[in-house]
Every structure is written in C-alpha cells, then in structure tokens.
Amino acid sequence: VITPASREGASRVRRECTASYVGDGFWLTAHHCVSQNPSMDGYLEQFDGQRAGIAGIYTLSDTDDVALIEVGPGIDADTFEVAQDPLDIGQQATLTGYGETHDYASSATTTIVAHRDEIDFGSAVYTDLFEALSATASRSCSGDSGAPVYIGSTIYAIHTGGGYNPSCVDGKDMLMWHTNIAPRATWIKSTIRMNAGLTESEESKAAAGLGAAPLDEPVSSDVDQGSNRPLTVS
C-alpha cells in the first residue's frame, strides 16, 4: 500500500501482507489485507526483487478472509495448486510469510487442532477457519497475513491471524488461525477463469501501481527454499 508521506506528494512503502501465486496472473491473499482499500494502487514484490503492479482485486464476501489480486507482467513464479479437501485435525503443514519487520521469508510448522465455524476478530468476523498451534518456536507475526499454509505445492489455507506479535518473537504452541481454502476453491477457480487477461484499464492501473515502487534496485534476500514462494503486498 502506498501512502502519502508529505504534502509534497512523496510516498513511502508499507509492507502489509503476503500473497501466493495461483495462476494466470492471480495471487491469493487475505480479505482483511485489501478490504480497507479494494481499489488500491500498489504492487507485489517477490523475494528476488521482481515486481508487478496491481491490476484488480476480487473478494468473496466480508466474512470470507480470502482475496485474489490480479497483476500485470513482471514476476515469474511457480503455481500453487488449490486444495479441494481440507486439512485434518492433527495434520501439520508449513506456513511461510514475510514478517512486517523482515526483508525475507520465514517458515513455521503449524499443527491443526480444531475447526472454527466463526471467529470475531473485533474488526471483522470471519468464517470456516482452522485453529492451529506452532509446532516449534517459529510462529506467525505481523506481515504474515495472507501467507500460504501448504503441503508440497498444494495450498490448503491462508493465514488470517495469531497472537499479537509485532516484533516477530518466537514461541512454541502459540495460537494461529488459518482460513480454510477447500470450500472457497470453486470461487477461486471461477474468478480466475472469468477474469483472466487484462483490459486496457487494468493494464493502466497495473502500470500506475508499479510506478509507485521505489526507484532504487531491490536487494535479493535469503528466503526459505521451495518451488513456490509467497511475496509481499505493498
């Protein structure tokens, strides 16, 4: 999200969330990452410095913490498969995201301990989530919202929230909540299918978002190894 830093019109970059590539120029993230500004001008940035401007944002509903971001060209990424079946209680998966204070991605093993029909987070009520615990000292922190919860190359959930942790402090057996992707898979696939390809106005919007990126050359940082890599939403 690009916000004015001064009356002279200068801008600063604020890294908000993490997103994962699901094909045809679309990236999956959390609804609460985009709900306050669904027409935002901005861009996505990958670990290697590749960037793509935001062309459009699609949401399912105010109670489904999922969103799709369509982008213009600029990023080469492997594609996550979208799960058709949910994770089971006791099953473990990997959560990989960008903490707000970090310039690199890190991973945590998350253990599913319960299914929650609804959770009131104060600012929003979201439905159909997994409740989970961090299996090791690695846990979620601010900036990880929208991050993939995956096994192999299949994404089963996206990270919605956890205990307050703005400084990204470690902690084992810490609570986290992830939005279940399986019941939203049909919406994800149909939205991509019906909106694949950029209109002229979407191309212009993507170019404007990319134009807001800093002029300095981004520096590649260490990230977790794997064929599918989440990136930050700016």
Residue ranges with predicted function:
Residues V1-R14:
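N-terminal activation segment of mature serine protease catalytic domains
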Residues V1-T3, P38-Q50, Q91-Y98:
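Short conserved beta-strand and strand-loop elements enriched in small hydrophobics
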Residues S11-V13, Y21-V22, T59-T63, D85-I89, ...:
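Extracellular/periplasmic catalytic domains that process cell-envelope and extracellular macromolecules
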Residues V13-E16, C141-S145:
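Short, small/polar residue-rich loop motifs at catalytic or cofactor-binding pockets
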Residues R14-E16, V22-D64:
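Catalytic-histidine neighborhood of serine endopeptidases
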Residues Y21-W27, S145-T232:
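C-terminal subregion of chymotrypsin/trypsin-like serine protease catalytic domains
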Residues H32-Q36, G72-D76, G99-H102, T154-I155, ...:
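Acidic glycine-/aspartate-rich tracts in secreted/extracellular proteins
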Residues T63-A137, D173-K189:
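Chymotrypsin/trypsin-fold serine protease catalytic domain
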